[in-house]
């Protein structure tokens, strides 16, 4: 039994290191103090300012359109999703697209009533587009 536990220890340590490397930093905007923005690796596609601007657009949209819901986490999935960005840009006839993922909680009313009450939604996608390096616009959102 102890040998099995010892063999599993390196996997446990790796899993722990992975979780620690995905630390969240609190958002700087006081109105969104419940939102944690997951640190992202440096992108070759977007500057940190581009990614932050997209996140700001989602937070603003969420605040006005998702009454009764609390945004708890927002993250950029990394450049590995570049093909997805390209597909969305083409579909939306835009120069660029970016996809962000979020988690949020609904209250007892289910937000505007269209969501399940008292539920946490994870890996909720936000698709944003822009032209000529302009302002990010939330184009669509949801699952998959």
Residues covered by each model-derived region:
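Bacterial N-terminal signal peptides that target proteins for export
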Residues: 2-10
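Short beta-strand edge/turn micro-motifs at domain boundaries
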Residues: 121-144
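Sec-dependent N-terminal signal peptides
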Residues: 9-17
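C-terminal motif of bacterial Sec signal peptides marking the signal peptidase cleavage site
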Residues: 19-21
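Flexible low-complexity loop/turn motifs enriched in small/helix-breaking residues
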Residues: 23-120
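A generic structural micro-environment signature
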Residues: 9, 77-80, 134
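Short, solvent-exposed secondary-structure capping/transition elements
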Residues: 6, 110-111, 135-140
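Residue-level detector of intrinsically disordered, flexible termini
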Residues: 4, 14, 23-26
